[in-house]
């Protein structure tokens, strides 16, 4: 399992939101590229970028910051937020991103995921954000009537590289990930699952490592590495040593 630092972009800054609320944000850096380099130097093998403005607007909004990050780092980066069509996917991949994340559009237009996987094999990730097991879309502003497991199963055979599962009631709240829901999703599908939302201590990392056999291959952490609750280098070292759970 790998630990993946998150860089959430809002108006060109690196921020963290509480429970996905755009008006409950904390700015941690006005230089996202510098921040990205810091996480690379701490040993990160992959960066998780989110265009928050794009997620709410439905179109890319932080292109300059994203380009600057890609130029600054040598490790792979994946990006989500506002990706709703093939043209946007192609444009982002051509910038140098390793993978793109389809979120809202995966629920509203599953055919886009299938087409994107065919056109860009191994480079498409589906982001599933859920509250009480039900999928949330449009930057978490809208709750749907489809379950996270049912949505994930739609993509079982189309070549999705991973599913990022975020429990939005946990995100930015430093309360630990939803282990039960994450494990249930991972066990229901054959696609690798990356856990997100609430990962806020080394113990949380250990708990996720303990369910790695279910298919949980990564943990995204955001607020905790910015506040110092998690030392990223220590977390990465922990996953490399293996769980003693």
Curated annotation (Swiss-Prot):
It is an enzyme of class 5 (isomerase). Pathway: Amino-acid biosynthesis; L-histidine biosynthesis; L-histidine from 5-phospho-alpha-D-ribose 1-diphosphate: step 4/9. GO terms for biological process: L-histidine biosynthetic process; L-tryptophan biosynthetic process. Its EC number is 5.3.1.16. Keywords: Amino-acid biosynthesis, Cytoplasm, Histidine biosynthesis, Isomerase. It holds the Pfam family His_biosynth. The keyword Cytoplasm applies. The active site is at 8 (proton acceptor), 129 (proton donor). It catalyses: 1-(5-phospho-beta-D-ribosyl)-5-[(5-phospho-beta-D-ribosylamino)methylideneamino]imidazole-4-carboxamide = 5-[(5-phospho-1-deoxy-D-ribulos-1-ylimino)methylamino]-1-(5-phospho-beta-D-ribosyl)imidazole-4-carboxamide. It is found in: Cytoplasm. GO terms for cellular component: cytoplasm. CDD domains: HisA. GO terms for molecular function: 1-(5-phosphoribosyl)-5-[(5-phosphoribosylamino)methylideneamino]imidazole-4-carboxamide isomerase activity. Its main location: cytoplasm. The keyword Transcription does not apply. PANTHER family: 1-(5-PHOSPHORIBOSYL)-5-[(5-PHOSPHORIBOSYLAMINO)METHYLIDENEAMINO] IMIDAZOLE-4-CARBOXAMIDE ISOMERASE (PTHR43090:SF2). Belongs to the HisA/HisF family. This is 1-(5-phosphoribosyl)-5-[(5-phosphoribosylamino)methylideneamino] imidazole-4-carboxamide isomerase. It comes from Trichlorobacter lovleyi (strain ATCC BAA-1151 / DSM 17278 / SZ) (Geobacter lovleyi).
